[in-house]
Amino acid sequence: MNIDPVFLNVKKLGSLIRGKELSPTELTRTFLERLQNIGPSYNSTVTVTYDLAIKQASKAEQEIIQGKYRGPLHGIPYGIKDLFATGVDAPTTWGANPFRNRTFDHNATVVMNLKNSGAILAAKLAMIEMAGGMGYNQPNASLTGPCRNPWNKNRWAGGSSSGSGSAVGSGIVPFAIGTETWGSILSPASYCGVAGLRPTFGRVSRYGAMTLSWSLDKVGPIALTADDCGTILETISVPDNKDSTVSFKRHSLKKYGPQDKVKLAVIKDSCIHADKATKNNFFNALSILKTIADIEEISLPDYPYEAIIRTILLSESASALEDFTDNGTASGLTAQ
């Protein structure tokens, strides 16, 4: 392979694959090697689905050779947070030692949507155990240990989608899928210097994913660019009768330009507590967005937002995880 695919974004990889300049099999082998050799040093990988990935890559390659191109993710490997059911192809641990060897008899809807798009499942990625439901403040509360930041291994990768952020940031997968209840996509994306998209509630099916909070859980992508995240979201946001909260309208990626007159609200003093570098990045991003949007600074009503969300989260997570606390499974967790 004459092209080094590491740190090429999804859009570029897809273009090379479609043009038959890049082999899905060779691409997948490259990332499988990185997952096996580099992933452990970041504690970001729980299971490398080697045989499955090679099988899916070979199928994708043959389809593309035959002119059966499925779309922009066809032939591209990815990793997924280890709370999505992946059938018997790989254990689904929820990041917790008591479930180290557990498999399910079904696949999560997002896994099936990506399979149907021709994307290649290469790894199950690390996470805070039980998605943080048993102790978000302990980075070591993860099956693989504290997930390390690709920019500085002495720092944490964020959570609870720790492995998803770290794996994309360290170039061991081109993109990943995470979940967010209260910051679990945006936090690791921010910590690891990559793009994360936390969709509107109900945009992506949660069927086959661990439940932490029925009212707050969301599924979304982590990738190298915002454009990539939009492409991935378009693929995974499909109506699903297995999740009654999912929108019946499929998401369609729209490219905005100055002619669209988009309005963008920015919350006043929203980054007042951020450090200088973060503030600079924030305002630089706003200056770019000003080329396609009218930006208006707004103030939100003075409500106790944190207390409201915490009340919902604590009550729903206590209910969702009740069986595991009652039967003693929780005693096997790292966070206490």
Regions found by a protein language model. Name each.
Residues 13-19, 79, 98-103, 217-224:
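Short, well-ordered beta-strand elements within core beta-sheets of diverse protein domains
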Residues 43, 247-250, 261-263, 267-268, ...:
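Flexible, acidic loop-helix segments that line cofactor/substrate-binding pockets
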Residues 53, 63-140:
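Acidic/His- and Gly-rich active-site-bordering loop/insert found
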Residues 21-29, 58, 276-299, 321-334:
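Acyltransferase
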Residues 1-55, 291:
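An N-terminal boundary/leader segment
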Residues 106-236:
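Short glycine/serine-rich loop segments
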Residues 73-94, 258-267, 311-336:
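Short helix-loop capping/hinge segments that flank enzyme active sites or metal/cofactor-binding pockets
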Residues 198-283, 327:
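A short helix-breaking turn/cap at a secondary-structure junction
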